[in-house]
Amino acid sequence: MSHGVFAYTWDLVGDPDAAARIAGLGADTVTLQAAYHSVRGITPWHPAHRVVHAEHAAAYFRLREDRWPGLRPLAPTWGVENPDRFGTAAAALTAAGLSVEAWLVLTHSSAVGSAYPDVTVRNAYGECYPYALCPSHQLVRDYALTIVSEICAQYDVDLMLEACGWLGFDHGSHHEKTEGADLSTTARRLLSLCFCPACRTALGAEADRLARSVRTAVDAELTGGHPTPVDATALLAHRGTVIADLVRETKSLAGDRRLLLMATDDPWVTGPDVGVDFQSVAPDAFVLKSWGDTAAAARQLKSAAARTDIPLIANVTALDPEWNGVAELLEAGATEVRYYHAGLASKARLNRIRTAITEARR
């Protein structure tokens, strides 16, 4: 049974003790940031910096100029300077006896979306979500697949995919001001449906009717009325087809490498964990977010295990003060665990990860 931890490249590059510290947790695998969205993170252990502000989404692997004919990720300018941060960090982890998974965020990039708004998600009101690249567009699919192919061409690592589909309304933008409207889960999901030109083309005549019904339902809720149900079957089916095709193409590029997919089996879900029918896609493992209430996470794992023979990996967070280990998740059907996050965790939280791994292996 594999126990792995998440880490950022800046946790390792410039810190000669980082790989040994991670290995000392008892982990056998590190899910290492290779293409990632903007973030501000603390680095409790690094000898050269304490706060890293990744101002935009970036590729942390070597960017070969001739491989990007369309959309192109940006390079990072923060942390310890290095022309190949992913490769340097991965080499240190491998030398410490750890396996490496490239952590690839595919369709979440405000930098690319702001430069190319025509390929971003647009809600039923025609409003652009610049952080959300829409994979209905061939340019976006090519961008995602080039990220994967470049990792496979340059490094001998497995792959974990985040945001392998649509992002939606829920994002957490800078100085977010949306909570006062008391939006229901249903309204948030309706505001996450995409009506960009590519999605409209896929839907055909259905697009106008659906967009109109979404606007009517959301407006009714916002004004205190009673929204009527919205039938988005055709759009959800379109999303499922695009995601399944993208996973299949990624799997082909991966070859013998393991392909792990952050996912949920609710087709309405958008975000880091793509909403898919577990019967329609075939990664080597599904990674299920098991944050928050452990009992609820265990029920989710048990339900998923009943519907697929593909292995399930529990993604747990040691950053949650209520986190109480993984025994219940393993009993529910998880075959592996990934712990978030070795670089962000305090000494006490690292000790909790170490204890959880030790107890799970008894």
Predicted regions and their residues:
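Substrate-binding cleft of secreted/luminal carbohydrate-active enzymes
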Residues: 283-297, 308, 313-361
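Active-site clefts of carbohydrate-active enzymes
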Residues: 218-232, 304-324
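Catalytic domains of carbohydrate-active enzymes, especially glycoside hydrolases
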Residues: 16-47, 52-57, 150-158, 276-288, ...
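Glycine-rich, aromatic-flanked loop segments that form ligand/cofactor-binding clefts
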Residues: 29-56, 82-125, 160-168
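Aromatic- and acid-rich polysaccharide-binding/catalytic face
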Residues: 32-40, 162, 215, 219-229, ...
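The substrate-binding groove and active-site-proximal loops of carbohydrate-active enzymes
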Residues: 3-13, 64-84, 127-142, 232-242, ...
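Polysaccharide-binding and catalytic clefts of secreted carbohydrate-active enzymes
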Residues: 126-253, 258, 263-277
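Short, acidic/polar
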Residues: 11-24, 138-151, 267-281, 297-300, ...
